[in-house]
Amino acid sequence: MTSPATRFRRAIVRLTTGCLLTAGLVAAGPAVAESAQPADPALAAARVVPVQLTGPADKRFNLVVMGDGYTAEETAAFRADVDTHLGVLWSIEPFASYRSYINVWAVEVPSPESGVDCDPGLDAPRRDTPLDMGFWGGCNPASVQRLLTVDSAKAAALAGLVPGTSPANRQIVALANSDTYGGAGGSYATASGGNALSSLITPHEIGHSLGGLQDEYDYYARGVAGGAYEGTEPSSAHHTLLTEPQIREQRAKWWRWLGEPSEAGGVIGRHEGGLYSTTGVWRPSRHSIMKTLGYAFDQVEREVMVRAISAKVNLLQDHTPNSAPIGADRTVWVDTLHPLGGELDVAWRLDGRTLRTGNARTVDLRALSLSAGAHTLTATVTDPTPFVRDPAVRGSAALTRTVSWTVDRALTTPGDLAEAAFTGHTPTTAPVGARSVVHADTTHPTRSAPAVRWRLDGRPVANPGNDRDLDLRALRLTPGTHTLTARIPGTEAELRWTVDARPATASYELSTPLRTVNRPGRPVEYVYDGPFTMGLAARDDQPGSVVRQFRVNGDGWYTYYGWPTDADAPFRFSPSGTVIDDLVYGKLGRSRAVPWDDATPDYGTHTIEYRTIDAAGNVGPAESFLVTLVKPRG
């Protein structure tokens, strides 16, 4: 295990090289605190730091990250760990597309002692820490080492210091100051802060805590195959006893996704193992983040997570008051959320008839020439994301909201002197990615709808209909850095963003091969007769964390983390894989996760691709090289 002092030195290096996602974490200013002075010393010493603010806490999903076992001198290590975990989280769908729904808060609470309980073994010292985190299920000999627990009451008390949050709109993630592999996903998610794999533990555990996803492991105790599943049809959305024909015929479980290339690699179908059983139960994909850390959520899990995230917020953030009838001499408006992955749809209907509004957020009733009497106007906000295929999910309150008004021509609307101005908008403090949706909301005078005019590098950008959202994907930006502005005509109001349209680049370094082969029109080929290492480095012209990924033979993209025992070491490929703590890493060819998976070497030529995902969400183009594995002589 790396010493806390070593981790502190590494954290200082990471902080001083400009890797933090947001400046707010470094220079937060005064702590956010409740008016009443907390009686608990830990609460009194806690400091709440806004890391990412996308809107009012009571209208957002709030991720509250707190550390345990970090002394005051190790605050830099906690901040660096938070940065690393968030960088990976934002690279994974659906968090990448719905990042704008989420506020992130860091709760810094100094620990009297460094580290957590029973780390790494049951005979390790018990530490005096604010959250009483511990491995082995809280130092339980009947548990497993990787089960990292937290005192839920103490965690909830710390989260309560974040104003505007409640158990209904927040997710707690507790990071332990440790390099030992571990985490848990009960009511709250836990993860070790500094393990090479720890930033991948966090989304896995949030999958449990927030999405209700289940483990796809085919073991419970490491190194021991789980045996046959003996239960009934699982309630889990991503486990089943049904055959593939039965899934189709009954339109059950993941039938809508069958046959699709899996985002986690391979094809969505029926793959045996899960729920800690080796046989007798099946999952959608050969591997996903709920089975093997490093891969993505597959489509089935991703759909569950979209609903879970969206259920924590209201797509319809605000609207023209509707508690009483309104006049026909005014405008009617709605304010919506703004996913980074694509704008929401707003459908307007008058007395059941669809109005042609071009997805606008405002309707001018004066232009409708309403007849005398009362009319009903409705606005339905829907998330059209392709991540969801189940109509029941699409039609749920998580992804569809409707508001209605009674409109009466006999009523006169009082004058409104509200000035046109910007209200909420995409943060301007960090670059936005070339495939993001940028938004700018405005005030709502009763007899006008302030227009938003967009310019890219000084040139007007047409954006009819919904002028509050601008989807940068439609602009096909040239590589480089651009300036985007939004203005309200007739006012001095202007917003300005830097658009990062140049992805980070990656480079690889391999251990010495037997030989190197260069052929015209083919990637460079390296020949090995045994294990070899691959280091991936990234460079970016913008600040922020860069995630590096690779994949073998077109399988799922896998997040590069160094090596399980050392984040600074290169990844190691070998013919049969390397067993570490009863898990298998780095088998070249068909991957292997546990010792009982097929260890037969895949001799021949393999394609290794690599790419980057930068802090703005830009996904770099994949580059590749070839590796040919030959049998050793003799």
What residues fall within each predicted segment?
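Secretory targeting and sorting signals
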Residues: 2-35
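Propeptide-to-catalytic entry region of secreted or membrane-anchored zinc metalloproteases
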Residues: 37-158, 193, 387
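Short pre-active-site segment immediately N-terminal to the catalytic Zn-binding motif
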Residues: 77-78, 182-203
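Catalytic zinc-binding patch centered on the HExxH motif and its immediate surroundings
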Residues: 115-118, 154-192
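Active-site recognition of the HExxH zinc-binding catalytic motif
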Residues: 200-216
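Low-complexity, disordered linker/stalk regions enriched in Pro/Thr/Ser/Gly
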Residues: 320-336, 340, 386-456, 474-634
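Surface-exposed, flexible coil segments in extracellular/virion-facing regions
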Residues: 352-365, 458-472, 563
